[in-house]
Design a protein with these regions (language model features):
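CN hydrolase (nitrilase-like) catalytic-core segments centered on the catalytic cysteine
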Residues: 60-78, 150-230
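Short beta-strand scaffold segments in enzyme catalytic cores
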Residues: 82-83, 93-98, 133-135, 196, ...
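Active-site catalytic loop in hydrolytic enzyme cores
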Residues: 87-162, 179, 242-252
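Short, flexible loop segments at the rims of nucleotide/cofactor-binding pockets, characterized by
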Residues: 9-14, 56-61, 120-124, 143-148, ...
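Hydrophobic residues at beta-strand termini and immediately following loops
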Residues: 6, 108, 135, 197, ...
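Active-site-proximal beta-strand elements of phosphoester/diester hydrolases
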Residues: 1-12, 35, 94, 107, ...
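Cys-nucleophile CN-hydrolase/nitrilase-fold catalytic domain and related Cys-dependent amidase chemistry
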Residues: 20-101, 176-189
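N-terminal phosphate-binding loop and adjacent alpha-helix
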Residues: 6-24
Length: 253
């Protein structure tokens, strides 16, 4: 199975050009699965406000809704990411799966919400799902750990015990080494491949890009960088199944 991770610009003004570049990249080398960053079609700075600006919120909803029909422009079977939604009066950061056959499918909403100057997520979002149940898409089983959730290895372990092949980790973060370490530890604890996708800032260090695909043993298989914002690797789903039977995944709990 071919798996692609992407950097995506934070600036709204650069988004259309980046989308067209991604279309061209996948046209030249089609893939099975694309992982995009966390809420990729909104500028993140709106979520740093300590009060909710409803105009900005509605714009974020519209920006993501408008992009859903455009996923079919990508030479990919599956798109994994998250987006802002409003359901039953709650604002949520909803992980989702899009497939060429069945369109949009919600999976779960982000549970671990930071309250930091870089993101006042407890202000903007309600807590979502405490459990991390994977979704099955044809031959692929995938669980989501959205951004800060990747730091919680109990969630990784839960996803692995449920038999998943892949953890999708859409993110919006800086370049602290914790993120690379977290992706590797999530893979080791779950026996899953981990695909992490991040934003990149052009005029600051707020978002570092540099995202990766990690093997079930925690080895980095490929990483993006400024010159190569998209990277595709071939993975064998059976590697994830074999990893479940080995240390430390086979420990009794």
């Amino acid at each position: 199975m071919k798996l692609t991770v992407c950097e995506f610009p934070d600036k709204r003004s650069r988004r259309e050009a980046a989308w067209k570049e991604l279309i061209q990249f996948l046209h030249a080398a089609p893939t099975d699965v694309v992982v995009l960053p966390e809420m990729p079609f909104s500028e993140w700075n709106i979520f740093t406000s300590e009060t909710v600006d409803l105009n900005n919120w509605r714009r974020a909803l519209a920006d993501h809704q408008d992009m859903l029909p455009r996923f079919s422009e990508l030479d990919a079977r599956i798109v994994l990411s998250s987006r802002p939604v409003e359901e039953t009066g709650k604002r949520l950061n909803q992980a989702f799966c899009w497939t060429r056959e069945n369109g949009y499918q919600p999976v779960r909403s982000k549970y671990y919400l930071p309250d930091e100057p870089e993101g006042r997520e407890t202000t903007w979002f309600a807590r979502g799902d405490r459990h991390f149940t994977p979704i099955t898409i044809a031959e692929l089983s995938v669980g989501f750990q959205v951004c800060s959730e990747l730091l919680f290895t109990d969630a990784s372990h839960e996803i692995g015990r449920a038999g998943a092949h892949l953890i999708a980790a859409p993110r919006a973060t800086g370049g602290h080494r914790r993120w690379r370490l977290a992706a590797s530890l999530a893979a080791i604890m779950s026996g899953c491949f981990v695909a992490s996708a991040n934003r990149r800032s052009e005029d600051s260090k707020a978002f570092a890009g540099c995202r990766s695909v990690v093997s079930p043993e925690g080895e980095v298989l490929a990483e993006t960088d400024l010159a190569s914002p998209y990277v595709t690797v071939e993975i064998d789903l059976e590697d994830a199944m074999r990893a479940k039977r080995t240390y430390p995944r086979n420990l009794t709990i």
